[in-house]
């Protein structure tokens, strides 16, 4: 298989995947190193393909639902509660954004759409002893969400307000 054929096959897999695919899994499948896959993804992006890197792997972002941004404020200990509320309302948490005084806007992709996704994310944070990115801003952060409707987004805002997590 040539490099061009491999990139085409990788893109095809990402297009049909229901969940992110790790660079390691793609490397094993195509009998190349993880670094080769990372390079292939970079070349696919350079060709104009929209490929998102999440903590669980690469994915093609879905174009369904309404995109909304919500401002939140809470401690790191409440991250799981916040994310559970979002996915329980039917939203996908696309990313988290903070405003850093030196670097400006920092965005980290998440792509969390279920309690399982949230649990895996929280487990990786705990295993790596990492702090949430919102620790940089005292807990203030934004999330970009994909919501099925305005009504769902309004319900989520009310839920987070009731939890004391909505920043306004």
Describe each region flagged by the PLM:
Residues 1-29:
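Extreme N-terminal segment that seeds HTH/winged-HTH DNA-binding domains in transcriptional regulators
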Residues 35:
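Key DNA-contact positions within bacterial/archaeal DNA-binding proteins
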Residues 41-42:
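Short, hydrophobic-biased segments on the C-terminal half of alpha helices
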Residues 51-62:
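Minor-groove-contacting beta-hairpin "wing" of winged helix-turn-helix DNA-binding domains
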Residues 65-168:
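Mid-protein regulatory/catalytic core that forms ligand/cofactor-binding pockets
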């Amino acid at each position: 298989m040539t490099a061009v054929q491999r990139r085409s096959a990788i893109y095809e897999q990402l297009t049909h995947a229901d969940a992110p695919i790790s660079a390691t899994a793609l490397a094993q499948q195509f009998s190349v190193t993880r670094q080769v896959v990372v390079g292939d993804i970079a070349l696919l992006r350079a060709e104009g393909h929209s490929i998102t890197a999440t903590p669980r792997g690469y994915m093609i972002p879905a174009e369904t639902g309404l995109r909304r941004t919500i401002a939140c404020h809470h401690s790191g200990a409440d991250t799981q509660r916040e994310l559970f509320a979002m996915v329980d309302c039917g939203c996908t948490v696309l990313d988290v954004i903070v405003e850093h005084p030196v670097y400006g806007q920092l965005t980290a992709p998440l792509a969390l759409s279920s309690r399982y996704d949230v649990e895996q994310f929280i487990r990786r944070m705990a295993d790596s002893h990492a702090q949430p990115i919102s620790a940089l801003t005292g807990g203030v952060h934004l999330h970009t969400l994909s919501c099925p409707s305005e009504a769902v987004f309004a319900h989520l805002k009310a839920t987070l307000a009731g939890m004391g997590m909505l920043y306004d």
